[in-house]
């Protein structure tokens, strides 16, 4: 969950089987549910499966979005940034080993939440729709040392 709205992760870390509703404050709007209807079941399923759960800051959400874009070419929305951010956190904590097979479901695209990453990556720019313009722009990015 995003730290600005993490009632389930907070309860899990505290070892509780119930959560306290919160007022959401996060860039991950699609996950900003302060009183999740299935929160109890999420806690129960995580405990029964000996799973793990955590929360990430909005900055870590943006870093997750950037990491996925740079490594896989996927522009995820903020919920996907939460998924990747928490995945990275669980790896750092040793709860997921670097060689473990792990699947991260990223179902929303970043076009829905562009405003969340504008400060970190800059505003998108437009080119005229042609292969020549694309190739020229792509080459400029490579020559400037930018990621293309």
Q: What do these predicted regions represent?
A:
Residues 2, 6, 21, 25, ...:
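Electropositive phosphate-/nucleotide-binding environments in soluble metabolic enzymes
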Residues 1-48, 112-113, 117:
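Glycine-rich phosphate/pyrophosphate-binding loop at beta-loop-alpha junctions
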Residues 28, 32, 71, 78, ...:
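Short glycine/serine/threonine-biased micro-segments
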Residues 2, 6, 25, 47-50, ...:
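A generic, residue-level signal for flexible/boundary positions that often mark functional hotspots
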Residues 16-20, 50, 72-75, 122-125:
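Short, low-complexity, polar/charged sequence segments that are solvent-exposed and flexible
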Residues 37-97:
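Active-site-adjacent helical/loop segments in soluble small-molecule enzymes
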Residues 20-25, 84-148:
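Phosphate-binding loop/pocket of nucleotide- and phosphate-handling active sites
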